[in-house]
From Swiss-Prot:
Protein name: 3,4-dihydroxy-2-butanone 4-phosphate synthase
Gene that specifies this protein: ribB
Binding site for Mg(2+) 1: E38
Function as written in the Swiss-Prot or TrEMBL entry: Catalyzes the conversion of D-ribulose 5-phosphate to formate and 3,4-dihydroxy-2-butanone 4-phosphate.
Annotated binding of D-ribulose 5-phosphate, by residue: R37, E38, D42, R150, R151, G152, H153, T154, E174
Cofactor: Mg(2+); Mn(2+)
Keywords: Lyase, Magnesium, Manganese, Metal-binding, Riboflavin biosynthesis
UniProt pathway annotation: Cofactor biosynthesis; riboflavin biosynthesis; 2-hydroxy-3-oxobutyl phosphate from D-ribulose 5-phosphate: step 1/1
Gene3D superfamilies named among the record's database cross-references: DHBP synthase
Length: 219
């Protein structure tokens, strides 16, 4: 067992299954990535069940840059261009232009307004005219192959929603410490205990998908 795994509860399969159950019940989960990557933890909620109080928690306890993870198909359906033509960020984080609901919001920055924007974007019949640009919600485009293609929080979020049987749209924000520094695994685990949230890793999800997909291929 690695030092990282020793801080976590259960096996990778148990952690993923617990996270899927939590998401189905409308609860948040905490996902950390590789220590040699961003080495950060994100608080993640299903977009379709996100409440105003959960959004307020993302704003209060995290960095405040609340992101909406979407599939490539959804990004295209909403007509969202990428934030920049040539992405030179270290981990190729796929930000589109930021968005706001075209109706039902005031300044767009409150918790309720951001939830309104997210609900407008993930609606089954959502179209480009339902959103204004720019805004206070930051969509991220997930790679089609999920965490097996890119080991990022964006892909982990969409994969978790799919595995949970939810819309493949999730909301994330990086957890920060009270002093504004980024929370690392020990602080993420403490945060999870305080708020009764499952903590898992992107690597857990990679292993879980590989296990399930290998079983399906062998059947």
């Amino acid at each position: 067992m690695s030092a990282k795994e020793s801080l976590l509860t259960g096996t990778f399969e148990e952690r993923v299954e617990a996270a899927l159950d939590a998401l189905r019940r409308g609860h948040g989960v905490l996902v950390t990535d590789d220590e040699d990557r961003e080495n950060e933890g994100d608080l993640i909620f299903a977009a379709e069940t996100l409440s105003d109080s959960q959004m307020a928690m993302l704003i209060r306890e995290c960095s405040g840059i609340v992101c909406l993870c979407l599939t490539d198909e959804k990004v295209r359906a909403l007509g969202l261009p990428m934030m920049v033509e040539n992405n030179s960020s270290q981990y190729q984080t796929a930000f589109t232009v930021s968005i706001e609901a075209s109706c039902g919001v005031s300044t767009g920055v409150s918790a309720a307004d951001r939830v309104c924007t997210i609900q407008a974007a993930i609606a089954d019949d959502a179209c480009p005219s339902d959103l204004c640009r720019p805004g206070h919600v930051f969509p991220l485009r997930a790679r089609p192959g999920g965490v097996l293609e890119r080991r990022g929080h964006t892909e982990a979020t969409v994969d978790l929603m799919r595995l949970a049987g939810l819309k493949p749209c999730g909301v994330l924000c990086e957890v920060t410490n009270p002093d504004g520094t980024m929370a690392r695994l020990p602080q993420i685990v403490d945060f999870g205990r305080k708020h009764d949230m499952v903590v898992l890793t992107v690597d857990d999800l990679v292993r879980y998908r590989e296990m399930k997909e290998n079983k399906s291929a062998a059947a």
